[in-house]
Amino acid sequence: MKIIAKLLAATTAIGMATGAYAADMTLKFGHVGNPGSLFEASVDNFAACVNGAMGDAVEVQTFGSSQLGKDKELLQKLKLGQVDFSLPSSVMSSVDDTFGIFEMPYIIKDRDHMRRVQAAMMDKFQAAANDNGYHIVGLAENGFRHITNNVRPITLPADLEGVKLRTPNGVWRLKMFQEYGANPTHMAFSDVF
C-alpha cells in the first residue's frame, strides 16, 4: 500500500502571535473530508491547538465536507483571501509536479520513510507552493491507498486491466491508473466516494 501525504496550504503568513492583532480574529479552514475522516481529525486538531494557544485573540473555524468548496475552489479562495487555510487532497499535483511524488505508487514504504521524504523535500515543496501563491504551514497524512471497485479484487496492477474507477484529481494518479490498464475518471476528492 502507498501512503498519501497531503499538503496543508495557506495564503496568509502565520504572524498571529504578534501584537499587531488587537481585535479578535476569525480564520476559516476548509477541507473536503467527510465526518470521521483523517482530514477532519487533522483540521480539528490544528484548530484546537491554535485556538488553545491564542485564547480569545484568534479563532480557527473548521468547515469540512466541501462546505466552502471542493479542492480547486478552495485553492482559488485561498488566493482571493476568502479562506485562510485549506487541507487539499491530491489536487496540489495539478498546481506543481513537485507535489506528485506522493501520488506515485509504491515509492513510500512506511510512515518513517514518508517522514524522511517529507523532511528531505520540504524546501522544494515550500518553493513550489510559494511560486504558485501558497504557503505550507504543515504536512498531514491521509493513510494508505485502497482501491475499491465492483468488478474483482485488486491485488496486482494487472488486476486493474479494463476496470472503470473514480479517482481524485491528480495528474500522476490518473496516469498511473491508465498505465495499469484501468479506465479512470478523475473528479473532486469529495465526489469520489
What are the roles of these predicted feature ranges?
Residues 28-45, 64-69:
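Extracytoplasmic "Venus flytrap"
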Residues 9-15:
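Bacterial N-terminal signal peptides
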Residues 16-22:
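Sec/Tat signal peptide C-region and signal peptidase I cleavage site
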Residues 31, 62-64, 89, 188:
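Residue-level recognition of beta-strand->loop/alpha-helix junctions
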Residues 47-48, 79, 84, 89-189:
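Contiguous mixed-secondary-structure segments that line small-molecule binding/active-site clefts
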Residues 71-75, 173, 192-193:
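Short, hydrophobic alpha-helical packing/hinge segments within bilobed ligand-binding/sensory domains
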Residues 45, 52-53, 59-84, 108-110:
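Extracytoplasmic small-molecule ligand-binding "clamshell" domains
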Residues 1-8:
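Bacterial N-terminal signal peptides that target proteins for export
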